[in-house]
Amino acid sequence: MKSQDVRKQFLDFFESKGHTIVPSAPIVLKDDPTLMFNNSGMAQFKEFFLGNGTPKSPRIADTQKCLRVSGKHNDLEEVGIDTYHHTMFEMLGNWSFGDYFKKEAINWAWELLTEVYKIPKENLYVSVFEGSKEDNVPFDQEAWDIWKTLIDEDRIILGNKKDNFWEMGDQGPCGPCSEIHVDLRSAEEKALVSGKSLVNNDHPQVVEIWNNVFMEFNRKADGSLEKLPAQHVDTGMGFERLCMALQGKTSNYDTDVFMPLIREIETITGAKYTTNDVTGISEEQNKMNIAIRVVADHVRAVAFAIADGQLPSNTGAGYVIRRILRRAIRYGFTFLGTKEPFIYKLVETLSEQMGDSFPEIRTQKALCSNVIREEENSFLKTLDQGLILLDAVILNNTGDTIDGKKAFELYDTYGFPIDLTALILSERGLKLDEEGFQEQLQLQKERSRAASKVTAGDWNVIVEDDIQEFVGYDRLSQQVKITKYRRVESVKDGEIFQLVFNATPFYGESGGQTGDKGYLEAQNGDIVYIIDTKKENNQTIHLTQSLPENITGTFNAVVDANQRAKTSSNHSATHLLHQGLRKILGTHIEQKGSMVRNASLRFDFSHFSKVTDEELLEVENFVNARIRESLPLIEKRAIPKEQALEDGAIALFGEKYGDLVRTIKFGDSVELCGGTHVANTSDIWHFKIVSEGAVAAGIRRIEAITSEAAKEYFESQAVSLAEIKEALKNAQDPVKSILALQDENAQLKKQLEALLKDKAKNMKADLAKELQEINGVQFLAKQVDLNPEGAKDLAYELGGSYNNLFVVFATAHEGKPMLTCYISKEIVASKNLNAGQVVRELGKYIQGGGGGQPFFATAGGKNVDGIGEALAKAVDFVK
């Protein structure tokens, strides 16, 4: 059975059972501070389990793109090593929100597996929760009794809290679960060892395929459980594992989910993959298989994340995506011999394979490919640089063990993979101080955890089952009651309180727009300031540094009108900017992200070349023309999404929209948007682009200002121009005067360079007398009174006259220390010397660094006082 048919039959089955089929949510999560990515099928329905919203149907089914790489569900280091873990995977799921419970969930799961998919009953085992004295939760007798009617009792297994009690996190909805496991071993293997003994024991052919979670409890901050007001069902079935079972394979990677990618990797790299049924393979072949599995898995995770709007970066979710991609690159580099980018080429195959089920991977194909290629180029350079640095560490090492601190520095500062370090050391007969490395890694993790630790108390509920109303589109103040609150403590923010109101005029941070600030006024006039507003799990959270004295009273919630006006001005300007870019650069332009603050706006968009100054001016003029036209805001609320799209509204990629949406229209600009906006474009006053640049391959970023910030910008420019005129003695044409000064300066620089070259030549004879012969090397380390360019000329002058030369010159031109190293080419190889390594090592003494070629390199720094020590240490390289 093909994977496309497996997916379709699942959705068709649950549709026949009265379930509404919904699309997958984006793999990247928004408005949930506890998760970076969708790591399970239920993540997009979390707000319903928490009671913060009502689903469109009490019965829902879907296939959800998931990513598991960090936290509780950390599978990253296992991926590729075994045959059934993945970073990105599909989770087939069906849900009941206060509707059916255990009986229907279990019976339907059994019906689908045994009657539709026709998995033999004798290949299946199930588990039920054995109970927990610690939590005072009894054995799940109900689930056991249901299973008894479907399967022999000797195939029902009792599971402990670890395996059969599912929790959303440290706090929140949870409950017992019942897992279904499939035994894919041969008849001969089954005769030798019972499958029952292998369930939940990490056997590659006895694996869990479906988990039915019965949500009936809430875990409180103190660890205790309380009953939920309604019972829910949350099930998840691993699509890749199901395909393995239905296609008669013993590895997920041998199914048609992965084999097209694997065959393409073979074609590109020349490597060969052996499927799981091939036995007796060599260790070298096993390593190659692992590398191919890693690449095939990771390109899916990275491409889907990029397609959903998450670019690789150095922080947060972007850093996780970069880590995944770099793991794939280094496996290719180490075990497949790939020294050039190749992973980006797999996006085409992935698009062909999965584009029908997930159209975003097809529409964003070019972006995914370009971003991955740029990341590959960058990291391959890092690997080359790391190899040079590792060579320097090895060269300066005494003994047969490399210090773990040194290895950690390569890993942490330069991004050089520790497993690659260990491999290279092993090849050279050296050992890695793994204990020292792990110690440094653990210290870093502890520092990171301590810095980001957040402790949240339980919600103190004042009003049960209250639905929050947002009134902030229409007014900036509202009489409110606090419905619940809690205390939160973090290293970053200290103690703060989170408040939820029955109604709020405050806009919570979402959709790229920052949250409102303002205050809460009690009836006696006491004020509590609201320092920020967030949107979490479909509820607006108001952050304060203290609680009102009478928490159950009635308050006037007031938004800071000035900040809201500035933020709204910038948000409306992003819509006009988007329209202008599409008009002037082309309709290929797509918004890839934005940040709207009260002070400025940032807009990321797809475009594969730098936007010229002329184009930027044209875009700026377009937006300002729309502002001068005084276009009124035409807003439509709660209209069907299909109708909005038919009316020409633009939907932003990576955003999750409900069935009912809001549209914002200014003239011909129409977008789906939940943010706040000006009533008329004239309220924006003026739009000014202040910067344009690249964010990633194919992604450009414009930063701009409007309103008061634009006025302040022009006032500042006027002051600067006046100061320039004054400095030029009130020249009538300051531009002409500046160009004349630049021309004069260039002539003087040329004269100065000629003088310095002459000075260097004159110094050559004196310095030649100071050369010392050490181990067959003509050595000199000295500070010279030249600029860096002069030091370079001097080094080359000496190099042209003397063989076996090793010189290090230091300069302190304009207070900036600089080191210049020249090594004769004949001793670079014979003495295993490298100028780049030399300046990197000596650069530490001047608080800097640098690099270059093996025979010539430079390093800059900040500490002039370190020059003496750097020069003194230079001789160690030739001793």
From Swiss-Prot:
GO molecular function, one term: alanine-tRNA ligase activity
GO-annotated biological processes: alanyl-tRNA aminoacylation
Pfam families noted in UniProt: DHHA1 (PF02272), tRNA-synt_2c (PF01411), tRNA_SAD (PF07973)
Cystine residue pairs: none
Predominant location category: cytoplasm
Catalytic activity: tRNA(Ala) + L-alanine + ATP = L-alanyl-tRNA(Ala) + AMP + diphosphate
InterPro entries noted in UniProt: aa-tRNA-synth_II/BPL/LPL, Ala-tRNA-lgiase_IIc, Ala-tRNA-ligase_IIc_anticod-bd, Ala-tRNA-synth_IIc_core, Ala-tRNA-synth_IIc_N, Ala-tRNA_ligase, Ala_tRNA_ligase_euk/bac, DHHA1_dom
Residues annotated to bind Zn(2+): H571, H575, C673, H677
Record's keyword annotation contains Membrane: no
Keyword line: Aminoacyl-tRNA synthetase, ATP-binding, Cytoplasm, Ligase, Metal-binding, Nucleotide-binding, Protein biosynthesis, RNA-binding, tRNA-binding, Zinc
Transmembrane spans: none
Cofactor descriptive note: Binds 1 zinc ion per subunit.
Subcellular location field: Cytoplasm
Annotated Gene Ontology cellular component terms: cytoplasm
Role of this protein: Catalyzes the attachment of alanine to tRNA(Ala) in a two-step reaction: alanine is first activated by ATP to form Ala-AMP and then transferred to the acceptor end of tRNA(Ala). Also edits incorrectly charged Ser-tRNA(Ala) and Gly-tRNA(Ala) via its editing domain.
Family: Belongs to the class-II aminoacyl-tRNA synthetase family.
Domains: entry comment: Consists of three domains; the N-terminal catalytic domain, the editing domain and the C-terminal C-Ala domain. The editing domain removes incorrectly charged amino acids, while the C-Ala domain, along with tRNA(Ala), serves as a bridge to cooperatively bring together the editing and aminoacylation centers thus stimulating deacylation of misacylated tRNAs.
Protein name: Alanine--tRNA ligase
